[in-house]
Each structure stands twice: as structure tokens, then as C-alpha cells.
Amino acid sequence: MKENIQTTLFQLLKQKIAGEESIGNALSDLLSVSPDAVYRRYRNETPLTIQELKKICNHFEISFDALCEMGDGKVVFSYPPLNTFDFSLESYLEGILKAFQKLKSLSSPEIILSVNNVHLFQLLNFPQLVRFKLYFWAKTHLQIPDYKDKHFRHEKTSENAFALGKEILQIYNSIPSKEIYDFDFMRGFMRQIQYYYKAHHFEDPEYALFLFDRMLLMSSHLKEQANVGKKFMFGTQVPASGNSFEMYLNETINSDVTFYFNSKEQQGLYLTHNIMNYLETTNQSYVSDSKMIIDKQIANSSLISIVNEKERNHFFYEFERTIHLFRKKIEADLES
């Protein structure tokens, strides 16, 4: 086997099992060889046999065709297929939690995030907003038949979904992050609420006002985090240490959502895909190129957490002013 294919395969395996167990333990039982024999293959001292390659690819759901085609300008991504979702809040959060648990298991992980419209992790402080976002995705974008004749209505978030969201938030908050925002933050989300109101997709039209009220709480909480430069859950106290939060303002526009992570073991990237799905890769060339771009985004943005109070206040003033404008339009229509 070509050395670069075997090397790439083991890089993908490290990505898939990161933090769960060692390469040696993960493959010794599967291949019926000792951990030492696995590491000889890992170091390219011993080539994998065709049967070993088949077992690995089948077990870890890796495309051998993609491995053979790897080269300059070609990248292997992994993603959760849509057929693995049942479009419940629980199902969606379970996939995100698994990714965060893998990230948290790495040594000294850090995050750099460019936010395009919605910040899902901050949204988790207010589960009703996440539930609406997922419902909109399933009914309007994917047109799932089960949602065709349904109206969105108020439902209490299940205990399981609440626990999943809380665990994701706890991990996200604990990992130092640099985050780039722009003035279009959450504007698309507001238009989605307005669209559902006009299309009579709310069982209770006044629920649209409730969602805008939750957005105002979200703005207040995000601003409080920016003031102190620390992430923490809504309704809790600011932590004495850790949870570092650097908030940057890009005065033009963030064209996409890029979630870059770095640790002592590896660096990688998540990209949004099909609106709310995501792609993941640890391809060194692609990740390095993306890191270079996001570093330039930060250089062209203004730090507004802790410092630059004037710019920070202006950002949140414009954000809340827009929320109030959308809310007042619906409120006036309800009263007419």
C-alpha cells in the first residue's frame, strides 16, 4: 500500500477515536494483532494487508475510494447523514454533544469561531429558540412530511433535551474561545420568526412575541459575557477563573460559519453544511489554509470583550434595536 494512503488512514482514525482510546487498543482486537503490531503499521514499518484495510474501513465507515483519491486540493470530510436524525431536539443535540465530548478529551483545546447569523451554542441558553430553529429546518427547508400540516406550538423542553443542552453548554463554556461576530448576527433568525407569523405557522400567534423576548434575554446575557470576558450559563454566576471568551466584531460580514479547534494532539475544522448540518476534517493542508483566513479575519476585526466599551455597546444597541423593530411590527399587527 502507498505510504501516504496508510498515513492518511491513520490520521482519519485518530480523528474518529480521539480521546476515546488509543490507536493500539482500538485496532488490536479488530485486526487480531498485538498493540505493538498496530503501532508498527501506524509508523508505516509494516504495510496493512488488503483484509486489514477492509476491516478498518468497514468498521470505522471510511471510504477507501476517497483515500485513493487523496492529494493536493482533495480533502476527506465526515458528517452525520440526515437519515441519522429523527428531527427531535434530543437527536440533534446528541450528535453535537458527542463532538464536544471528543474535543474536551483533547489536551488544552481551544476554539476559534466565526459566527454567521445564528450562534447555536449561545442559543442553548434558551432551549425554546433552539427548538424553533430545528423545527424551521425540518418543516420549511427539508420539508419533512410529518411536519407538513403541523403548527409550531409552545412545548416544555423535555428533561432529556434540557440535560443534553446543559452538558453541551458546560463543555463549550469551559473551552477558551475567540469568536467573530458581525452586524447581521441573528437577523436571519428574526426573519424566520416573522415568516412563520405571516404564514400562520404558529398555533398561537403571540408565541412569536415570546421568541423575540427570549432573544432580548439572549442579547443581555451575551453582553454580560462580553463585559467580563468569560462564558457562563444564563442564570448562573460568573466563574472566578477559566471559561475565557474573546469577542470580536467584524464590521463587514462573516460569509460562513467556521469552527476551528486546536489542541496538543491535533487541530481540526467544522463547517456548516445543509443549513444546520456540519462537515468535519483534520486534513492538515485544508485546516492550515482555513486557520490562515480566520486569523486574518480576527486581525481585521475589533476586540469588544472587556475592552472597547463604546464599540461593544453600539453592537448590542443595534442588535436589540432590530429585535424591538421586528417585535413591534408583529405586536402592531396583533392589535389591529
Residue ranges of each PLM-predicted region?
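Hydrophobic protein-protein interaction segments
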Residues: 137-315
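Exposed alpha-helical structural elements
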Residues: 8, 26, 37, 88-91, ...
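Helix-turn-helix/homeodomain-like alpha-helical modules used for DNA recognition
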Residues: 73-150
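Residues that form generic nucleotide/phosphate-binding pockets
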Residues: 12, 16, 30, 99, ...
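Charge-dense, low-complexity intrinsically disordered regions
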Residues: 311-336
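Charged, low-complexity, helix/coiled-coil-prone segments
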Residues: 1-5, 31-39, 124-133, 147-165
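Short secondary-structure junctions and interdomain/linker hinges
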Residues: 16, 20, 103, 107, ...
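Basic, Lys/Arg-rich alpha-helical nucleic-acid-recognition elements, primarily the DNA-binding modules
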Residues: 1-80
